[in-house]
Amino acid sequence: MPVPASWPHLPSPFLLMTLLLGRLTGVAGEEELQVIQPDKSISVAAGESATLHCTVTSLIPVGPIQWFRGAGPGRELIYNQKEGHFPRVTTVSDLTKRNNMDFSIRISNITPADAGTYYCVKFRKGSPDHVEFKSGAGTELSVRAKPSAPVVSGPAARATPQHTVSFTCESHGFSPRDITLKWFKNGNELSDFQTNVDPAGDSVSYSIHSTAKVVLTREDVHSQVICEVAHVTLQGDPLRGTANLSETIRVPPTLEVTQQPVRAENQVNVTCQVRKFYPQRLQLTWLENGNVSRTETASTLTENKDGTYNWMSWLLVNVSAHRDDVKLTCQVEHDGQPAVSKSHDLKVSAHPKEQGSNTAPGPALASAAPLLIAFLLGPKVLLVVGVSVIYVYWKQKA
């Protein structure tokens, strides 16, 4: 029986089978697609490039791949296969190649701020917006960053020997968090210090702050305090920061006042020796009985081996100008500190008066007068007595 021309043409069994298999294949492709991120975590040094691997097992459903840092509504778009400008991101494979399933990316010039978990996400093509289809498990990127050079700071004001002063050491921007810090004075490790690493929790980078206590001695002008930082990112020696104790210490002077004889009559040379002081800034004032005689600023200093200085000032005193004893004072102002002083008592002796014509003879001269008279008049007396005796003799004989 012939088939009427008005009946619809029924699909052949082959066509039905083809359509059915195509539909089943598409559904199976969607169900079987997997987004594979083989690296659970990677670590990259700051300044280098990081490669984030991602492959898919199917090209179905049709739609782009996008990369994000973080998950949830606040995640950050790192790369979009179809649109956008991402100057630091390049693809590892040729995405224009047919049947490409490798969507790995490379991020250049990594900084600590790039640390985080990166997700490779497959989208299904939609209109007007694409719909997220499946995400990879994520790859955690950690950044190894070197610590900055340690900066050591001392106290704001100078301190004298036997006092305890504090020094601080800071270093920033390193990752991971583990770090070692040590203090040294002249090569000897210090133990009295406290160290903190911030923040306490997870962070893209960290900072370290340490405070050490140092007891000053008179020999510390040439001493150094060193802060040493060791970190996994440092290939060679640890980083070091240094502070010179010459910028911290003040060594007060010791004074000695002495009297030196001079050849000139009625003059005495008094010297003031200022010893073992640091820093150099010093002013000296001479006082006679409390009155200022002379003020001078230290110059032409003598440096000692320990870094301290010596200086000597002298004062020439005219003794004849004084009727009474003189108190000489050497007063020193060092580095803006209250003055210190040392005194010396200068004895003024009574001077003998010149003898005049009316000056009474002393006891010694009075006792010697009779002897002197006898010595001068003795021969004359004997002569007179002799002449008298001869005259009497001739008178009687006649």
UniProtKB/Swiss-Prot annotation:
Membrane topology: Single-pass type I membrane protein
Bias (Basic and acidic residues): 337-354
Keywords recorded for this protein, A-Z: Disulfide bond, Glycoprotein, Immunoglobulin domain, Membrane, Repeat, Signal, Transmembrane, Transmembrane helix
InterPro entries named in the record: Ig-like_CS_Receptor, Ig-like_dom, Ig-like_dom_sf, Ig-like_fold, Ig_C1-set, Ig_sub, Ig_V-set
Cysteines paired by S-S bonds: C54-C120, C169-C227, C272-C330
Glycosylation sites (chain numbering): N244, N291, N318
Cytoplasmic compartment spans: 393-398
Domain (Ig-like C1-type) ranges: 147-246, 253-347
Cleavable signal peptide: 1-29
Pfam families: C1-set, V-set
Compartments where located: Membrane
PROSITE patterns (alphabetical): IG_LIKE
SUPFAM superfamilies hit by this protein: Immunoglobulin (SSF48726)
Extracellular-side segments: 30-371
Domain Ig-like V-type: 31-136
Membrane-spanning segments: 372-392
Disordered: annotated segments: 337-361
GO cellular component terms given for this protein: membrane
SMART domains for the chain: IG, IGc1, IGv
Protein name (database record): Signal-regulatory protein beta-1 isoform 3
Function: Immunoglobulin-like cell surface receptor involved in the negative regulation of receptor tyrosine kinase-coupled signaling processes.
